[in-house]
Amino acid sequence: MLRAACLAPFFAILALAVPAMADAHYTVSPSCGNQKHCFTRLQSALDTAKADTRDHWVTINVAAGDYYEKVTISRHKIRLSGAGPDKTRLHFDAVAETAGKYHRRNWGTPGSAALTINADQVTVEGITIENTFDYLTNDALPDADPKRISNSQGVAVLLDIDSDRVLIRDAALIGYQDTLFANGKRAVIRDSLISGNIDFIFGNGQVLIEDSEIRTRNRAVAIAPGEFHSYLLAPSTTLIQPVGIVVYRSKLTREAGVPDHSVALGRPWHPTTTFADGRYADPNAVGQASFIDCVMGAHIHPDHWTSMNGTARDGTKTAVFSPQDSRFFETGSTGPGAAHRDIGITWKDALDITAVRRHLFDGWPEASAP
């Protein structure tokens, strides 16, 4: 016992003398030449990083360029850093109708993602991530046209089931339907652009979008006055989670051609789920969405929120889920789209931004400061 006590200071000094594990660094570039640790494909760099099982950060610097590939991040502590969203672009053109082959359960929507993040502690910055499926050409086809693709979802970024503590900043996430699929745990998107039209920010994840732009893109079909052109959010937050999709201090904008008073802030998504007594819309997916101190353009519909159909117990899409039965909240809205009709939204248990931050940043100090 005495000997151990005498040796304790020695081991303490030795521990202090051991340097911290250095981060690993790789480069992705359209042309590497003789440069070491350089790859022409992003997935090759990520695969090499995954083979490194040490508990340190791996930084992958992605040079300016246009990268057409489908990418998955499955290693923890990855930092993906582009040259700027106007210089570095990752894109892929998969669509849900045919993308099941890319997914572990043959599901087309998550399979369509240009970038899948399925790991803890991931930072993505300085890059555009785009699903380039030709949505508008397909949208213009008549329903009876055999060339029309019915499942036209095209995800740009999938936050998959094992993702947590994902920070996306100074980035552009571009698509049309289902641009950002939040299907994991915590994520923060900061100083970025997210664009799309149909339910283009959706899922059961806990996401804070702050100091960003949410831009509605056009449709190829004419929308009658009073009808909904697009929907920003479609949360499917489980009841046990107090935070779903929170948009803070951001601007809601539109492309030219998107009509006034035509875009809903959100609608409740109850995903079709298999239970012991059948397959139907999940009654426990009571979506939570908040808009806090946001500037809303004139394209926002005066009702602000709307309903969404789901799968009934008989298998038909006749179950209707209303915003009044969801966890929708807004406060501090400004701009021409801020005024709205009272449609009976009464839920008052939303967390304020301080509480949202406290909930999301527990054990994640790196994301707490802009």
Residue ranges: model-predicted function:
Residues M1-A8:
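Bacterial N-terminal signal peptides that target proteins for export
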Residues A17-P19:
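N-terminal signal peptide c-region/cleavage motif recognized by signal peptidases
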Residues M1, M21-A22:
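Initiator methionine at the very start of the polypeptide chain
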Residues D23-P370:
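Sequence-level preference for short, compositionally simple segments enriched
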